[in-house]
Design a protein with these regions (language model features):
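Glycine-rich anion-binding loops of enzyme active sites
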Residues: 1-51, 172
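Active-site glycine-rich loop that binds ribose-phosphate moieties when present
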Residues: 8-22, 60-82
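Helix N-cap motif at beta-to-alpha junctions
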Residues: 149-155
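Solvent-exposed alpha-helices and their adjacent loops that cap or buttress functional pockets
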Residues: 1-4, 23-27, 45, 58, ...
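Acidic, Ser/Thr/Pro-rich beta/coil linker or hinge segments at domain junctions
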Residues: 161-202
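Active-site-proximal betaalpha loop/short-helix elements
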Residues: 67-142
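Alpha/propeptide regions of enzymes that mature by internal proteolysis
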Residues: 10, 157-161
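A short beta-alpha structural unit
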Residues: 143-149
Length: 202
């Protein structure tokens, strides 16, 4: 049952120079760049809604840090930087988290992808919360985290970092096949299901 207000919105905007970057504009051989951290919004939500229960797993400072992640939900600045750099696809990692967003970029672009799981940035607070609540932070809503497809991803990551935005290359787009590379293992990257947020419990 719906127990909280739900708001739906239709948004209309104008493009600059008639150029639009879609989720499906990636090309094989490009790098996958990620901004900020896995589970950005989900961490803030869980730390607020389950604050009392989480006190036995996190220090007061860690809880405050986790709740403060709500300040990082805008992707406007990195979008402008990536657009100017020449990125061909971008996707905000909302429901389904980082892995869901990467899968959607590959799916919409008709491509495969290799995801370097160990290179995905994540806050220690997020790890602790997800461990306590029995969920995977890679599938946790990550609004504020942008997934970008571009050539020479390391250079773009450096450009983002120069502007104070955490960024890392976490994958490579391929002609076919979608995989996660974990501890020298090559595991299938499956289509995202429900967000880990809905499975969280103490």
């Amino acid at each position: 049952a719906v127990v909280k207000p739900v708001i739906s919105a239709a948004v209309i905007g104008k493009t600059r120079n008639r150029k639009i970057l879609s989720t499906g504009g990636a090309r094989a051989g490009q790098d996958v760049i990620m901004t900020k951290w896995a589970g950005t919004e989900g961490t803030a939500i869980l730390a607020k809604e389950w604050e009392e229960g989480l006190r036995q797993y996190l220090t007061e400072e860690e809880l405050q840090n986790a709740q403060a992640m709500k300040a990082y939900l805008s992707v406007g600045k990195e979008s402008e930087i990536a657009f100017a750099y020449g990125a061909t696809a971008m996707h905000d990692a909302t429901e389904g988290g980082v892995l869901g967003a990467v899968w959607e970029v590959a799916e919409c672009s008709g491509l495969g992808v290799d995801v370097f799981v160990e290179k995905i940035p994540v806050k220690e607070e997020t790890k602790k919360i997800c461990k306590a609540m029995g969920i995977d932070y890679l599938g946790l809503i990550s609004s504020g985290t942008m997934i970008i497809a571009a050539e020479n991803g390391e250079r773009l990551a450096e450009r983002l970092q120069e502007e104070g935005i955490a960024a890392a290359v976490i994958g490579k787009l391929t002609e076919s096949g979608r995989y996660m590379l974990v501890n020298d293992m090559r595991l299938p990257l499956a289509q995202p299901k429900s967000d880990a947020l809905y499975e969280a419990k103490l």
